[in-house]
Amino acid sequence: MADDSKLKFESWNDPQTVLHTPIFDVVNENKKAPDGKNGTYVKIKAPNWVSAIVTRTQADFCERFVMTAQYRHGVNKVMEEFPCGMVEEGESPLDAILRECEEEIGLDRSKILQITKLYESNPNPAFMDNRMTCYYIEVEGTCRQQQNLDENEFIEVRYHTDSQVESIMKSPDTSVMMKYAWAEYKSRLLNLGGI
């Protein structure tokens, strides 16, 4: 095993929050580099995120993938995505994705047949401290109840075939994390014969 101690930076004072927003904080950290030089490094402290690939099992559903469409301010476009959202304080990733699916797509928990964790990863460890956890959720039938959206959330539920999701994943605006979730789902399906 490699000795990473010669690559580590050491903090020499408490981090200072330089910007606080409703969804993340920007923090300056003063650290000593391995060569002994001091520097200030920027970190974004953000909540953990969750997402889920949700499928419907009923045989007559060709459009079995449940996705959401909503306006994304970062790209100023309506994006189609897998249900996703922030993990609230004190909430587990699993509880968070179940809550988000209830809110966004009207998921009826009694219709869940299977839940599997696909992956957990840091979206950008260069300057972010949060984690993204993605699940696969299989539901029986339509799974629909009433949406329970947050204030200022405008989300439309959409159903897609496998090939339609493939097309969405090829868009340059689709997030890396959504693309990775889809790739992990497809890999498990092809290599393991199922999720």
Task: Name the predicted role of every residue range.
Residues L7, I44, S51-I53, D60-R99, ...:
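Conserved Nudix-box catalytic region and its N-terminal flanking loop in Nudix hydrolases
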Residues D14-I53:
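Acidic, metal-coordinating catalytic segment for phosphate/diphosphate chemistry
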Residues P47-N48, C62, Y71-H73, E81, ...:
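Active-site segment of metal-dependent pyrophosphate-handling enzymes
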